[in-house]
């Protein structure tokens, strides 16, 4: 029966089965790959409803925008080495994620990238300003200046 299903349908079966086992630890590798937009929404709702204080879900993914509302801590690996491992609340206390004017570059900027809206930046959060964590920018900042990021969090 499974061999007649599309890749996305198979993915839904496997994710549903994994969640239905009610295991305390569930590992998922790229669970949203192959899912269409409505299915990604279903996935987020299913995972959100299945999580509680007694369950841990570890997701390996390149599709971070599909999952950012579900994530409470982030681990970034380089090969077999963990180069970053922090709770989201600690990340936004120490780093500021913002869109700045193209002329706004100072030494607190760790990483920036051009966009139509301006410069997307990751900065040291020296003022305690609140910002929304951008996981893709964080990933790029970690690999652009690993040493500086590690010093900020250690």
Model-derived features: where do they sit?
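ABC ATPase nucleotide-binding domain "signature" loop
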Residues: 33-35
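Catalytic Walker B motif of ABC-type/P-loop ATPase nucleotide-binding domains
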Residues: 26-30
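C-terminal coupling/interaction segments
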Residues: 109-154
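Hydrophobic anchor residue at the start of the ABC signature
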Residues: 15
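Helix N-cap at the start of a conserved alpha-helix in ABC-type nucleotide-binding domains
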Residues: 37-39
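ABC ATPase nucleotide-binding domain "signature motif"
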Residues: 5-12
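ABC transporter nucleotide-binding domain
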Residues: 43-122
């Amino acid at each position: 029966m499974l061999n007649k299903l599309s890749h996305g349908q198979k993915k839904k079966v496997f994710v549903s089965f994994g969640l239905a086992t009610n295991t305390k630890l569930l590992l998922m590798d790229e669970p949203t790959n192959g899912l269409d937009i409505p299915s990604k929404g279903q996935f987020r709702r299913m995972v959100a409803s299945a999580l509680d204080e007694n369950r841990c879900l570890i997701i390996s993914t390149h599709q971070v925008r599909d999952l950012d509302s579900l994530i409470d801590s982030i681990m970034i690996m380089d090969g077999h080495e963990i180069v970053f491992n922090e709770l989201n609340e600690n990340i936004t206390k120490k780093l500021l994620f913002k869109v700045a004017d193209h002329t706004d570059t100072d030494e607190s900027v760790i990483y920036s990238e051009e966009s139509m809206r301006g410069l997307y930046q990751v900065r040291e959060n020296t003022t305690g300003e609140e910002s929304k964590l951008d996981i893709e920018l964080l990933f790029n900042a970690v690999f652009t200046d690993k040493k500086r990021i590690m010093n900020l969090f250690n």
